[in-house]
Every structure is written in structure tokens, then in C-alpha cells.
Amino acid sequence: IEKIFKDWYKRVDVIYGDMIIRRSDGVYYAKAQDLSHFENDFPLFHPSTFIARSVFVSHLFDVSYRISADFKLLRDVYYEHGKFLYLPFVFTNFDAIYGLSSSECALEILRERGRIYGKDKTVGWKFIYMIYSVNLKIKSLLKQILKFCSSSCYQRVIKMRVPNHLERIS
């Protein structure tokens, strides 16, 4: 890692890589996605991202975002044609069971992303937010019912919800 930073730190704004994610249903290798995904999602993992000091000085975190300040900063750098370097290397082992990565923060993340995309005041976005909120409540209720009724069925449902960029390793 030291050699990488010695060779690259003055030539790029952001170095990012992959990570291992521990979820309630297993351990996964998470490969960063193509940066074009910034249009709809967060294609890289902030724990596996190194940002040049000059970027922090020129962009600063927008602290009005409780959860998505890192997303906004990196998205802004990307759309300002910042230089990103992807390294196919696991920089982080990450626990996604608790904290901000848990599904309980999903609504706040969606709300903040709406602000970042500049869509949060539109009727369409408010409708999407309402549908998403109801969807999360229904999923939570169904998970509780499945856990109570059938452990094997619950495990199958959890496995179906694994994003494409995750590869199960245990």
C-alpha cells in the first residue's frame, strides 16, 4: 500500500478498491462498480477509499448531510472530472450488520440522496419516497413473520436480496 501511495498520491484525487462485507447472511467480496453508477448509486465504498488532502481542502464535507456527506463529496469530485484510480485490492473488512449500513437507515439515505440529486422537492420524488417507505415497512414485517414461521424460507429470501456486485465467500 505504501508503494501505491508513493507512486500515485500526487497524480490522482481518489484511490479506491474493494472490500469484504460481513452481513447477517454471510461474508461477501464486494467489488467497486464502474464510476458511471454515480448517476444512480454509490459505486465505491467509502471505507475503501483514500482521498487526496487537496480534495478535502477544495471540497469540504457538507455537514448538512448526516449520512451521505462522503457520497456528495465523491460524486462532486467525479462530476468535476477528478482523477480516480481503482485498485483491485481489498482495503477494508466491513461489518454491515449494525450502524449506518443497516437497513434501518435506508430512508434517511434515500432522503439525502434525493437532496444531492436535486430531486427531493419534486412530486415524483416524494411519491417514490412514500412508496419506498411503505415497501421497507412491509419487508420488515414479512421478515419478522418469516423468521418466526420458517427459518429456511427466511434464509432463501435473504439470499435473493444479495446485490450483483457482491460475491459470497463464506
Region annotations inferred by a language model:
Residues 10, 82, 105, 122-123:
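Alpha-helical structural elements of signaling/regulatory helical domains
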Residues 17, 23-112, 116:
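Conserved nucleotide-sugar donor-binding catalytic segment
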Residues 1-28:
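Conserved donor NDP-sugar-binding/catalytic core segment of glycosyltransferases
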Residues 7, 116-119:
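Alpha-helical structural signal in soluble globular domains
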Residues 118-170:
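Membrane-proximal basic amphipathic "stem/tether" segments
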Residues 8, 64, 166-170:
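Extended hydrophobic/Leu-rich segments
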Residues 13-15, 87-89, 126-128:
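A short coil-to-beta-strand element that immediately follows conserved catalytic motifs
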